[in-house]
Amino acid sequence: MAKEDSIEMQGTIIDTLPNTMFRVELENGHIVTAHISGKMRKNYIRILTGDKVTVQLTPYDLSKGRIVFRAR
């Protein structure tokens, strides 16, 4: 998936799932399942319930995404 093919949206973590998966509520009200990107995992970025995050979605499956940024 090329970077320009993905859709980036803002959301809030509402639930933590096993294996570094999270349930994220997007700004438009949709709920998606997202995992942490490799660079965030490598740098040990901790994500907790209630954090504001940026999620990349692929146009092929809008129910799954990748967390690429955690807002402070």
Curated annotation (Swiss-Prot):
Coiled-coil regions listed? none
Put simply, this protein is called Translation initiation factor IF-1
Gene it is expressed from: infA
Q: Which residues form the S1-like domain?
A: 1-72
Molecular-function GO term, any one: rRNA binding
Note the superkingdom of the native organism: Bacteria
User: Which NCBIfam families does the record match to this protein?
Assistant: infA
**Family membership:** Belongs to the IF-1 family.
The reply to whether Flavoprotein figures as a keyword in the UniProt entry is no
